[in-house]
Structures are given as C-alpha cells and as structure tokens.
C-alpha cells in the first residue's frame, strides 16, 4: 500500500517513520529545500540558533513517540533545565520556577507570601486534571464526533473547567496578579490568549513543574537531522523542492496529488501543513468551508554575541508593566504592543557548540498580533525598544556585544505559508479545541488524513507528534477494516 505525505514538518516526519515501520511504501513531498517545518536553525558567521521552538516540554511523551518511530535514546541528548526559568517584573520583583515543589514553595514564601497554599492546591488539582485530560483528549482522536459526545467526556470537560479561562481559573489559587501571570503565560507557547483560552491549558504550567523543562543538545532543530537520516535509512522516498498543488479526487476518495505539475498516485494521503492553507488543496465539495481564528504571532530577534552571560538562566521572561494590556493589543486591537513582555533564550550557557569559542547566541521573542495590517518593515523603533529592555533588565552591555543580528516578523511567517502569519497554527480557543479542532480525518474524503499544529490535539512539538501518532492509528484502523471487507483502501 502506497502513502503520499504532503509536507515535511515534524508531523509529516513522524508519520512517515511510523508508517514505514508498519511496512507501507511512503513518499514525502516538501516544498522547501529542507525538512522540519518550524524546527529550523538560523545560521550565520559561525553562529547557530533555533529559529522556532526552544522549550522541550513533556519529555516522556517526546521520547516515547520517537522510540515508536525508531529513534533510540542514544541518538539525541536531552538536558534537564533547573531552575526552569526566571520571570522579571517591572516593579523590580522576580519569580524563579524550579523542578522541586519544596523549593518552589520556599520561593513563593520568600517573594509572594500568602500564595504558597494555593500553589500546593494548584499542583494537586492539576495532577488529577492532567491525567484525566491526557486519557480523554490527548490520547484520543475525534474524527468520529460521536466518540467525543459521551457522558464521560462531558463530565471530564466540566472537571477540567473548560468553561473558564486560564486566567480566571487561577484566581482560585493565587491572589497575586504576578503569580497568575507566571502560571498563565504558557498559553502563549501555543499562540493562545491566557485571558480567553480554556482552563484546560493551565495544564501546561503544571507540566513544567511535574515533568520538567529540557533542552535538546545542539538545538531543538538538530532533531530534524536525526529524523531525516532515519527516513532515508528506512527507505522513505523524500523529495524536497516538491510543491503539492492540489488533491485529485474520484468520488469520495483521493486518487492522486499534483506535485510540481505531475500526478502522483497513492492509496492514502497525508496533509502536513498549516491546515487552513493545506485544506485548500482539497476540492471545496469535499472540504466543508470554515473560518478559523489564527494563533498569535511573534517578532523574533536572533543575536550572535562576542560573549556568554554565564550567570544568565537559559530561559527568562521580562514582563511588561501591564500584561492584560499586552494581551489586548495582541488579540483584540491588533496593534504594535506598547510595553510588551519578552521571552529570552540563551542556550550558550549550557551548549558551547552554537557559536565560536567564547561567543554566544541569544534569542528574544515578543508576542504580537497575527492577521493585522501592521507594516512590520517600518517597526525598527519597536525592535530597538526590545533590545533596550533586554540590555537594561538582563543582559548588560548587550549592544556592544552584538556581532550579528537577524529579525523575523509575522510577514516572514505569512510568506512561509502560516495562516495570517500566526506562529502556532490555529488558536487554542474553546471552539478550536478537542472535537471542534480539525481532526486527523479532516474532510469527506475517506483516504485523506492530516497532521500538524492546527490538527487535534494541537500545537507544540510533542503534541504535534502525538497528533501524528493518532493519525497513523486511524490509517491502520481504516486499512484493517478495508482488508476485512476484501477491498483496498483506495477502493
């Protein structure tokens, strides 16, 4: 049985490896000259830094799925980050997150007294909800909608407080607004508004403490080389600079892909691209029309430095004076943030391979609106203000240390095919989560499947990998059912 995969992002790569292990003949088509999608490096003058994802979450899920795909633990190295990260507030206070719950309680007692009991209760409640959510949502596909609307699932949704926002749900645990920011900003990892995203996404901040934060040595994007080598060694046919233009259909099934103007036939097809765009390859009569809300975007600054800030944490957040105002500017008024929060990533503290000897790299991310009319080419002043904040609050002498600099904006992301320039797929709103999110079987076509950040269960590298795993299970199930009926998957 032949399977054609359109797109070489992480979802496409994991899908290809898993399907090949099951004995299928797999071809993968990638429009760019490299694989990996959002997992990529920016490299220049001997400096190398991750272009997109940097924080490795859910390490057990990541390693388990890689193992299922044939990637052994000795092919990559995960480094535990502890402290997890440090948050700096405009009033001069700070909050450091730790792996150790006991150390975290002490941190809260010392800096935000009165919130420690709430933290203990938060961790207890979230552990129960995490296990529920993992079992009922992360590990299940809802392409058959009936499997979602069960009494058990509805009870779980209520238990997960899906009807509340992340920010509002945290008011039951923390009196101090700064602590609530520290446990709600994680929705921005997947492009969601903490003031609006369902409370089930509070589980991200819980997971940081419970499962830890890790760094993949060499950079997160170094995983792509490992996966690509595995693809080639396993016999997957990989074609780069191969643009998939559309899906050719015959009745209720797909018959072929048009790739660089040529017809490529297969028995089943996988779409691995930002789904609002990828879905346009499917004829309208087979793909119900739908309006999507894009995730937030970001302005990214990459620096090559002539030094390493040895006392710096790997991850830091420099919070603005009004977090709620920043969120309003991103998600409602769609304007350039006036006093934004900034995430900084300085991996050279633990990885000397990213820059010339004695030098370092620095990455800064500012959440900004997607789908806005902002002319990012005219926002040099905004970039300079971000650099000023980094220098004043965390990296003294930064400007003098810069040897190389690069800036990426929502315009770059939109040019690369990301929906409205959003960085994380479609937004994790209530009605774009769970059963309401595009599923692994997203259309009326019985042999077309999908993987990626906009597909259930959502964004973030391990979660996209989990979505690919669910999608492969759907293909296997369909194939087995068809074999029992005595016909091939393509009829």
Curated annotation (Swiss-Prot):
InterPro entries: Amino_oxidase (IPR002937), Carotenoid/retinoid_OxRdtase (IPR014105), FAD/NAD-bd_sf (IPR036188)
Pathway the protein contributes to: Carotenoid biosynthesis
Domain of life, per lineage: Bacteria
Enzyme class name: oxidoreductase
EC number: 1.2.99.10
SUPFAM superfamilies the UniProt entry points to: FAD/NAD(P)-binding domain (SSF51905)
Pfam families reported in the protein's UniProt record: Amino_oxidase
Residue positions of the active site: 208
PANTHER family: PHYTOENE DESATURASE (PTHR43734:SF1)
Swiss-Prot/TrEMBL GO biological process terms: carotenoid biosynthetic process
Reactions catalysed, as given in the entry: all-trans-4,4'-diapolycopen-4-al + A + H2O = all-trans-4,4'-diapolycopen-4-oate + AH2 + H(+)
Residue stretches spanning the membrane: none
Protein name: 4,4'-diapolycopen-4-al dehydrogenase
Keywords: Carotenoid biosynthesis, Oxidoreductase
Purpose: Involved in the biosynthesis of the major C30 carotenoid methyl 4'-[6-O-(acylglycosyl)oxy]-4,4'-diapolycopen-4-oic acid via 4,4'-diapolycopen-4-oic acid intermediate. Catalyzes the oxidation of 4,4'-diapolycopen-4-al to yield 4,4'-diapolycopen-4-oic acid.
GO terms for MF: oxidoreductase activity
Organism name: Metabacillus indicus (Bacillus indicus)
Family named by the database record: Belongs to the carotenoid/retinoid oxidoreductase family. CrtN subfamily.
Protein encoded by which gene: crtNc
């Amino acid at each position: 049985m032949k399977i054609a995969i359109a797109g070489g992002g992480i979802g496409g790569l994991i899908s290809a490896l898993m399907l090949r292990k099951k004995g299928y003949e797999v071809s993968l088509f990638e429009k760019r000259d490299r694989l990996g999608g959002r997992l990529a490096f920016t490299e220049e003058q001997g400096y190398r830094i991750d272009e997109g994802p940097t924080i490795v979450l859910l390490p057990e899920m990541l390693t388990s799925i890689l193992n299922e795909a044939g990637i052994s633990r000795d092919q990559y190295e995960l480094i535990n980050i502890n402290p997890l990260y440090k948050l700096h507030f405009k009033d001069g206070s700070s909050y450091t997150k730790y792996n150790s719950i006991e150390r975290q309680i002490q941190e809260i007692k010392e800096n935000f007294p009165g919130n420690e009991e709430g933290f203990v209760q938060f961790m207890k409640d979230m552990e129960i909800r995490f296990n529920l959510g993992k079992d009922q949502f992360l590990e299940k596909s809802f392409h058959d909608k009936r499997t979602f609307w069960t009494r058990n699932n509805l009870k779980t949704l209520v238990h997960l407080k899906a009807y509340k926002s992340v920010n509002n749900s945290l008011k039951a645990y923390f009196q101090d607004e700064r602590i609530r920011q520290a446990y709600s900003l994680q929705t921005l990892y997947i492009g969601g508004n903490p003031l609006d995203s369902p409370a089930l996404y509070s589980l991200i901040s819980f997971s940081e403490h419970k499962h830890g934060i890790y760094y993949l040595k060499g950079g997160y994007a170094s995983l792509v080389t490992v996966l690509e080598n595995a693809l080639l060694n396993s016999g997957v046919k990989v074609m780069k600079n191969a643009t998939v233009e559309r899906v050719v259909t015959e009745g209720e099934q797909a018959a072929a892909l048009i790739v660089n103007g040529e017809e490529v036939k297969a028995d089943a097809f996988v779409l691995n691209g930002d789904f609002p765009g990828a879905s346009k390859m499917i004829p309208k009569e087979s793909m119900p029309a739908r309006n999507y809300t894009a995730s937030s975007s970001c302005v990214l600054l990459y620096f090559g430095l002539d030094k390493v800030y040895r006392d710096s944490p790997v991850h830091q957040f420099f919070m603005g004076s009004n977090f709620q105002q920043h969120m309003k500017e991103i998600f409602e008024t769609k304007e350039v943030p006036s006093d934004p929060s900034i995430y900084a990533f300085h991996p050279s503290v633990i990885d000397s391979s990213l820059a010339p000897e004695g030098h370092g790299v620095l990455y800064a991310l500012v959440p900004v609106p997607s789908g806005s009319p902002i002319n990012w080419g005219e926002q040099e002043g905004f970039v300079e203000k971000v650099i000023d904040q980094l220098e004043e609050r965390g990296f003294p002498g930064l400007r003098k240390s810069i040897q190389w600099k690069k800036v990426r904006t929502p315009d770059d992301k939109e040019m690369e095919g990301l929906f409205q320039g959003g960085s994380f797929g479609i937004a994790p709103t209530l009605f774009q989560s769970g059963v309401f999110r595009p599923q692994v079987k997203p259309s009326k076509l019985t042999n077309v499947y999908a993987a990626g950040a906009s597909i259930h269960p959502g964004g973030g590298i391990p979660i996209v990998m989990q979505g690919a795993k669910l999608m492969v299970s759907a293909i296997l199930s369909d194939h087995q059912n068809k074999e029992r009926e005595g016909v091939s998957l393509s009829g």
